[in-house]
């Protein structure tokens, strides 16, 4: 681990060059950010960057991880830390979106960030202002992590049936022969959570469950107690319990190791029915959650279809009288998703990302909102208007840059001519300076015969172009967009920029999964500086993951020990 700091500085310099090349080619950067409290009792914020190259390559990289030294993590302070990263890398005015969780300080952070971007933009030279005219604004660039929203919806469903998980797992721990079932708990989930801890920590029950799984030829799965911040932990617990229902029933029916467990924590037939009803609800959220957290391909373009699909399924189940538990839970989840979906409809990013997808375009909105009137529906018209607005911004930027370069070239010619001896004047040579219709006759002769009867804009041509197959692979989608880059230059750029926006803050969360391994409970003295170096170098491919914990040795002062 020699010269760790020097390797970090070299890696950051290379990253900055890569980012600047992308920006100079007209590209924009999307960010994710999230906070984390480490085992070393320090708080951190991670910032990741995402973009697509002209070749369609999807880039996702850790930009920085910073220790939060201020005990009050308000929005202004978070914005200050975010700007430290973006200013140092020279990307502040190229940021188009920030994907974050729903914590209220993030609202202020993005408001402050928008103001900082506007201030920097106002101080730029004319050419740079033209290049960065599509600058960050919170209305269009604030992306709420949909995985967090899904979690809020599921937690609302669990709360509605009095089954939401307690923050403290010891709530479900029971001393031997002293197990109880609180009156305010819904028995099915309380019992399963309690059993998860019993089968995890008690040797005899665990051994009996494993043996019964072997006897019944059912794969043993660790039954892990869930946590409130991740609904999929509840889903995993529930799936494991239902897959091992027969072994669990058999063990609890015949066990003699704890009579209080037999009396209070053994699930009844009704309890198992409740768990199976809730498994139906979790199934609705499972695929969209997994899909939204991918890192190597676009995710935002599926947000609207997934929202509508979940809302419509929940709408069906909230009327299911024959499944009373599912009915209540689905109603609560439906209310949450509907509220957040309405908020998402007022922003442009999801619509633009969807319409730029060559498999979807506007056709998918006509399909999704068919019940509301299809192409005459309010949401279809809103989506089309959002797309046209963003196209207009990109088009104005392209025209502005082209006009600026033309004017600069013209000035250069004039300056060069002014420094030369005057040439003999040719009749009509300066006609273009005094005649506003100079060249019009030639233009008409060239174009009149092919002049269309209707306006044929790039948007019109894009929407008329047939959608490619819904089953097209990522490589096929990339190849298609590459082949159409000349025909649709503006929309191709929009597709690259909006296709890179992450639907969730999962990329930042993944950083902390790695950090959790680095800052182990027995290794809490590692300095924040070294945490930053190691995590960034891994993300940048300079420190490969094989150079893992065995090679990263920390001394008593929290410094990484260089190995022989």
Model-derived features: positions:
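Polyampholytic, low-complexity intrinsically disordered segments
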Residues: 377, 384-401, 407-411, 519-564
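Short, hydrophobic/aliphatic alpha-helical segments
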Residues: 20, 88, 214-221, 486-501
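Conserved, non-catalytic sequence blocks in retroelement Pol enzymes and Pol-derived host proteins
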Residues: 36-39, 68-75, 100-101, 228, ...
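Histidine/cysteine- and/or acidic
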Residues: 52, 57-239, 545-553, 562-563
């Amino acid at each position: 681990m020699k010269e760790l700091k020097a390797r970090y500085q070299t890696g950051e310099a290379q990253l900055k060059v890569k980012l600047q090349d992308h920006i100079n080619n007209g590209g924009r950067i999307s960010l994710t950010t999230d906070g984390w409290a480490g085992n070393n009792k320090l708080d951190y914020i991670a910032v990741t960057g995402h973009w697509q190259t002209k070749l369609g390559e999807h880039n996702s990289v850790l930009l920085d991880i910073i220790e939060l030294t201020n005990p009050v993590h308000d929005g202004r302070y978070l914005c200050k830390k975010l700007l430290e990263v973006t200013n140092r890398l020279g990307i502040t005015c190229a940021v188009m979106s920030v994907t974050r969780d729903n914590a209220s300080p993030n609202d202020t952070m993005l408001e402050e960030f928008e103001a900082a971007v506007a201030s920097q933009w106002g101080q730029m030279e004319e050419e740079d202002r033209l290049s960065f005219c599509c600058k960050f604004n919170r209305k269009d660039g604030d992306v709420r992590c949909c995985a967090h929203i899904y979690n809020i919806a599921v937690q609302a469903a669990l709360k509605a049936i009095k089954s939401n998980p307690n923050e403290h797992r010891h709530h479900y721990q029971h001393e031997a022969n002293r197990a109880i079932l609180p009156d305010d708990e819904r028995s099915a989930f309380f019992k399963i959570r309690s059993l998860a801890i019993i089968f995890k920590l008690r040797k005899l029950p665990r051994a009996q469950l494993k043996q019964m799984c072997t006897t019944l030829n059912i794969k043993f799965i660790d039954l892990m107690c869930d946590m409130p911040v991740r609904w999929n932990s509840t889903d995993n617990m529930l799936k494991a319990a239902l897959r091992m229902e027969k072994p669990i029933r058999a063990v609890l029916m015949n066990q003699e190791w704890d009579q209080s467990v037999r009396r209070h924590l053994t699930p009844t037939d009704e309890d198992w029915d409740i768990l199976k009803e809730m498994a139906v609800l979790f199934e609705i959220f499972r695929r969209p959650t997994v899909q939204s957290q991918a890192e190597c391909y676009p995710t935002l373009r599926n947000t609207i279809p997934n929202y509508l699909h979940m809302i419509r399924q929940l709408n069906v189940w909230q009327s299911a009288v024959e499944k009373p538990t599912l009915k209540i839970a689905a109603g609560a989840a439906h209310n949450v998703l509907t509220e957040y979906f309405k908020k998402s409809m007022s922003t442009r990013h999801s619509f633009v990302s969807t319409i730029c997808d060559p498999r979807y375009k506007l056709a998918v909105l006509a399909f999704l909102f068919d019940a509301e009137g299809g192409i005459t529906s309010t949401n279809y018209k809103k989506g089309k208007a959002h797309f046209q607005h963003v196209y207009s911004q990109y088009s104005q930027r392209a025209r502005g840059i082209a006009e600026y370069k033309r004017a600069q070239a013209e000035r250069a010619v004039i300056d060069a001519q002014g420094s030369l001896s005057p040439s003999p004047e040719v009749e009509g040579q300066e006609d273009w300076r005094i005649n506003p219709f100079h060249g019009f006759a030639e233009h008409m002769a060239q174009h009149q015969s092919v002049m269309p009867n209707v306006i044929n804009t790039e948007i019109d041509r894009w929407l008329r172009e047939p959608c490619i197959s819904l089953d097209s692979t990522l490589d096929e989608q990339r190849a298609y967009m590459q082949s159409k880059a000349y025909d649709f230059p503006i929309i191709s750029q929009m597709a690259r920029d909006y296709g890179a926006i992450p639907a969730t803050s999962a990329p930042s969360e993944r950083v902390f999964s790695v950090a959790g391994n680095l800052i182990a409970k027995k290794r809490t003295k590692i300095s924040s500086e070294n945490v930053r170096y190691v995590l960034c170098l891994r993300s940048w491919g300079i420190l490969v993951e094989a150079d893992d914990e065995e090679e990263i040795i920390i001394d008593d002062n929290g410094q990484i020990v260089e190995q022989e």
